[in-house]
Amino acid sequence: MITPQQAIERLISNNELFYDEMTDLMRQIMRGQVLPEQIAAILTGLRIKVETVSEITAAAAVMREFATKVPLENAEGLVDIVGTGGDGAKTFNISTTSMFVAAAAGAKVAKHGGRSVSSSSGAADVVEQMGANLNLTPEQVAQSIRQTGIGFMFAPNHHSAMRHVAPVRRSLGFRSIFNILGPLTNPAGAPNQLLGVFHTDLCGILSRVLQQLGSKHVLVVCGEGGLDEITLTGKTRVAELKDGKISEYDIRPEDFGIETRRNLDEIKVANTQESLLKMNEVLEGREGAARDIVLLNTAAALYAGNVAASLSDGISAAREAIDSGRAKSKKEEFVGFQPQQRCHFLGKMELG
């Protein structure tokens, strides 16, 4: 067992923590057994030293261990569409829009997200703005996935142990290991993922982490300029985990017959209301940059979720899902989802 003080000493000496040590330390943090000042020192030490694949893997495994899970009989076909945030791009909610298009094209989407930290609109903000219920129980999220093909998991509802860390993170004011742990800890256990990151170095790192955590088919992407999505403005770095192996390559919009844009101004928004408006325009079939970036990211989600055989096939499926009106209908179905209620008779008989 490693004590918090021993961990701090190791980190300030620029030495990494071994997997078992990081596991033990993270469990202590999640149980509330580490002082806030010590957590701050640990997060600072990890950031300065730079977190290793082993340290991130251990921390993510413990967060999964402590998470309130979504009870699904079979999570094999699930895909998560998520980003680390932190890119400062102020774009509309691309991955959330892609969630509806992907589900309309046949994917089972288990999306994990929270409120805005650095963006104009977080995934949870826009889901709430459209009228959906953020506070479903884990059982109700599972119902939603079975019934609509989409489950949205509001991160604070599934990671209550993070209450021991949240005040420290806010007070530090810089990115820490926890900024990349959230997307690695899907409570529904989705084995397939489109994961956007804010730096190209993280593509290789997080693909290796997810490999060690047992993920099946993952695309970790970083758009030119640090966008945590597949971008329209140039190349996107991709690290793909498939069949246990990792390959890295670059893609560009023109590879798929999509116009490269000079900038992202057309898809920037100031707040959640503007983001929802942009989302609705895409789902209603309006042409433009917003539609194009959703096509690219939906294609990657469909490919990661093994619904499409390739990114090119994914583009075609995404386009058809929008143009047929099915993507718009899928959003309405998700927002209108009403969980089945169990009936209790005299506190003894349960029907349902």
From Swiss-Prot:
One of its GO terms (biological process) is L-tryptophan biosynthetic process. Anthranilate 2 binds at R169. Its cofactor is Mg(2+). Binds 2 magnesium ions per monomer. One of its GO terms (cellular component) is cytosol. The keyword Transmembrane helix does not apply. The keyword Ubl conjugation does not apply. This is Anthranilate phosphoribosyltransferase. It comes from Neisseria meningitidis serogroup B (strain ATCC BAA-335 / MC58).
